[in-house]
């Protein structure tokens, strides 16, 4: 399957005005499809609404869903299949990783509490490593704290979630490329202009 197969189809998605919309429209354009003319995109406020609509539409449904909703939906309906992985498709047209979640700290706090920020990042990296290395333990924790209804869903979804730790120049390159996509789609999405170098955290930034 390819993006060409989406031409003339209706796509169900969450996130109008947020990451899902901008990434989907970017990838459609990169693959020669006009998102305003060649496809119809229907937006819903929650992923659960998308899966409900898919169930109602049955075999004709095409949807953009994040993990773990993809896995949860497939566990309920074995006929559902992933035909395009947006992370892989992003990697085909962009030299940097697709970013869907970041950690943000206020500059004033980072300058006043540099050790706390650094220690948090160390713990965060350990958490990322644990999420990838201890699937069973992480899945159980996901159920315990209510991230997913059942650990079995998390266990299947976690290896597909692309949970990574990025910092420094690597992080800056990935985030900057993503913000450029947002800016090109709608400057207002990033406050009207792209951020300067001070926007990105480095230990050197804190040490000033």
Regions found by a protein language model. Name each.
Residues 1, 21-27, 98-107:
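Periplasmic solute-binding protein
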Residues 1-5, 32-35, 108-117:
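Short helix-loop capping/hinge motifs at secondary-structure junctions, enriched
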Residues 1-10, 189-195:
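Immediate post-signal peptide segment of exported/extracytoplasmic ligand-binding proteins
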Residues 3-72:
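Bilobed "Venus flytrap"/periplasmic-binding protein-like clamshell domains
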Residues 35-39, 146-157, 190-196:
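Short, surface-exposed acidic
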Residues 49-141:
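Pocket-lining segment of extracytoplasmic ligand-binding domains
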Residues 110-185:
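Secondary-structure end/capping motifs
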Residues 176-208:
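Conserved C-terminal helix/tail region of periplasmic/extracytoplasmic solute-binding proteins
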